Swiss-Prot record:
Similarity field: Belongs to the MinC family.
Keyword Cell division set for record: yes
Cited HAMAP family: MinC
Known partners and oligomeric status: Interacts with MinD and FtsZ.
Name of the protein described by the UniProt record: Probable septum site-determining protein MinC
Signal found in the keyword field: no
Swiss-Prot/TrEMBL keywords: Cell cycle, Cell division, Septation
Native organism taxonomy: Bacteria, Pseudomonadati, Pseudomonadota, Gammaproteobacteria, Pseudomonadales
Organism (species): Pseudomonas entomophila (strain L48)
Chain spans, region Disordered: 109-142
Described function: Cell division inhibitor that blocks the formation of polar Z ring septums. Rapidly oscillates between the poles of the cell to destabilize FtsZ filaments that have formed before they mature into polar Z rings. Prevents FtsZ polymerization.
Gene Ontology biological process terms in this record: cell morphogenesis; division septum assembly; regulation of cell division; regulation of cell septum assembly
Length: 250
């Protein structure tokens, strides 16, 4: 081994878990022409949202009696509008086969990911001597993350395990993420995603709602929908009821 070579047992990579906010595009029917037109309308309303946005194509709600979808064509339409397909979610055999043919990862249908696993039964072992139960672990409480400076376009701020408070304004193209609630005391013009690990009780509080997108536990509204709300530009709170986002005055 030359003096400049690194020993082979020195690790050159690490595998790390990560939580990313990924948009899911759920198709209700196989109609790529209509999809192209409707995506173009969405892009016109919130262009910053459709800028190299990672995407999962959800095909598991397509009717079983509809023909096979043109998956490469669907991906081209998404790419044309700034959406970068990472994987599909599918249950129909023809959709899964089409994804495998182009080396695109296939995720299980939405319900399958939430189904509890049933462990294999194990052979009965001799019962050990009883031991006193361990003291319950103290729950990990993460402090609220507070940002006192303006959040500029292109910035992404994440409050892991807690709430996020921004005392200034949030510019277009900026992104706020929190496992808990999000509070913005300035103008909210970027994207706010609360409860991103599935907390349906999370809320978003804004003193001036002019956001590109708001989302709670994966349910979202984009600028086009928000502008039609009579509380656009006002102080509001956003909450989730079932799969419906509710916007009410503060």
């Amino acid at each position: 081994m030359s003096p400049n070579q690194t020993p082979d047992n020195t690790p050159v990579f690490q595998l790390k878990g990560s939580m990313l906010a990924i948009t899911v595009l759920e198709l209700a029917r196989n109609d790529l022409e209509s999809l192209d037109r409707q995506l173009a309308a969405k892009v016109a309303q919130a262009p910053n949202f459709f800028s190299n946005t990672p995407l999962v194509l959800a095909l598991d709600k397509l009717p079983a009696d509809e023909g096979a979808i043109d998956l490469p064509g669907l991906m081209r339409i998404c790419r044309h509008h700034g959406l970068r397909t990472l994987a599909i979610r599918a249950s129909r055999i023809e959709d899964i086969a089409a994804a495998i043919a182009i080396d695109l990862p296939v995720l299980p249908p939405s319900g399958a990911r939430e189904r509890p696993l049933e462990p294999e039964p194990e052979a009965k072992k001799p019962e050990p001597e009883p031991t006193p139960p361990p003291a319950p672990a103290e729950p990990e409480v993460r402090p609220t993350r507070i940002i006192t400076s303006p959040v500029r376009g292109g910035q992404q701020i994440y409050a892991q395990g807690g709430d996020l408070v921004v005392t200034g304004s949030v510019s277009p193209g900026a992104e706020l993420l929190a496992d808990g609630n999000i509070h913005v005391y300035g103008a909210m013009r970027g994207r706010a995603l609360a409860g991103i690990k599935g907390n349906t009780k999370a809320r978003i509080f804004c003193q001036q709602m002019t956001a590109e997108m708001v989302s709670i536990a994966g349910q979202y509204k984009v600028c086009e929908d928000l502008r039609r709300d009579p509380l656009w530009g006002s102080g509001v709170q956003v909450s989730l009821s079932g799969d419906v986002l509710n916007i009410t005055r503060l």
